[in-house]
A protein has these predicted regions:
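An exposed, glycine/acidic-rich loop-and-rim segment of catalytic or binding clefts
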Residues: 1-157
Length: 157
C-alpha cells in the first residue's frame, strides 16, 4: 500500500506461460517467448524484485513487459508487510506488468515516489497487435459492439 516501502518484496503470480519481448524502445517484436526458467516466470508465486539484476531487466530497471494470459484469473499479488492481497480477473488477452523503474522523484501523497514505489497490472491487448499477425486486434468495425471486463478483488488479513 501507499507509504509501505517499495514493491520488490511483494509476492506475485501471473497466469501466463508466454511474454512478448520488446525492442530498444519497448515495442514488442511480435514474437512470443516462454517464461519458464527466465526472470519473467511468475507462474509460481515469487517476490517481484527477485530477478531485477537479470540482464533482460536492466534497460527497464525492473519489469515493463506484456504477458499473454492463460485464463481469466490473470494475477494474484500480496504484501507480506501489510497483508493486502489483490486478484486480477479479465477477459483481455494480455497483462502489462510495470514496476515503476522509470519513476524518479514523482510527487505523491506522502512525498516523492522513487523507483519501484509501486507496481501496475494492466489488462490490455498486446501492444502493437494491430501490426502483428498472431495477436488479437483491438479493432471495432462499424456497427459492432464489444465489451471486456476487468475486476480487481482486494482482501487483507
Amino acid at each position: 500500500g501507499e507509504s509501505s516501502g517499495d514493491c520488490r518484496s511483494n509476492l506475485l503470480k501471473i497466469n501466463a506461460c508466454y511474454y512478448t519481448p520488446s525492442d530498444g524502445v519497448l515495442i514488442p517484436t511480435g514474437e512470443k517467448r516462454a517464461v519458464k526458467n527466465t526472470p519473467f516466470d511468475f507462474t509460481a508465486q515469487k517476490k517481484i524484485g527477485g530477478g531485477f539484476n537479470a540482464k533482460e531487466l536492466l534497460a527497464t530497471h525492473g519489469y515493463d513487459h506484456n504477458y499473454i494470459l492463460n485464463g481469466e484469473h490473470a494475477a494474484h499479488a500480496e504484501s507480506e508487510v501489510t497483508g493486502v492481497k489483490m486478484d486480477v480477473f479479465t477477459d483481455m488477452p494480455c497483462l502489462q506488468f510495470y514496476t515503476g523503474g522509470q519513476l524518479g522523484g514523482v510527487n505523491g501523497k506522502s512525498g516523492k515516489y522513487n523507483r519501484w514505489a509501486g507496481f501496475c497490472l494492466e489488462p490490455q491487448f498486446c501492444p502493437d497487435s494491430i501490426n502483428k499477425q498472431d495477436f488479437e486486434k483491438p479493432v471495432l468495425n462499424k456497427d459492432e459492439e464489444k465489451s471486456h471486463y476487468i475486476k480487481f478483488n482486494f482482501a487483507w488479513n
